[in-house]
């Protein structure tokens, strides 16, 4: 399933083969501890995929209803902290690394447009990669329902209706209309 998501966001080749080996573990809210750098210390990485057999990590920063945070220096973001952690940590610095920003917020995507270090992904791609598994697994079905409810909340008419309509139209055009 994870390989399907990577494929959906345009990741292929070596990464797909590596993920299909299934030698990795996933840590949610991976905590960066005991860093000498204030920028890194006690920060959290939303999803941290680690394969210690094949020496790779995948970092997924999840921004469903929030924006990428800048730190007090005004120059560095939490995305910079994630990258720096993977580069500087003795355990991971020689590992192959993939960074994914998961968000439907266009402002968040703009932070990574000029960087070759992060891959942008949105929740519609997650949803699309889950659809083929919903009949096989009740947990996936429940997650897909939850994700849909988060993406399309029941809002009052005077609350960001145009945003909701835009997301509905985008979802139909990019996901539903392409189902076979």
What are the residue ranges of the model-derived segments?
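Charged, terminal alpha-helix-loop-beta segments
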Residues: 1-180
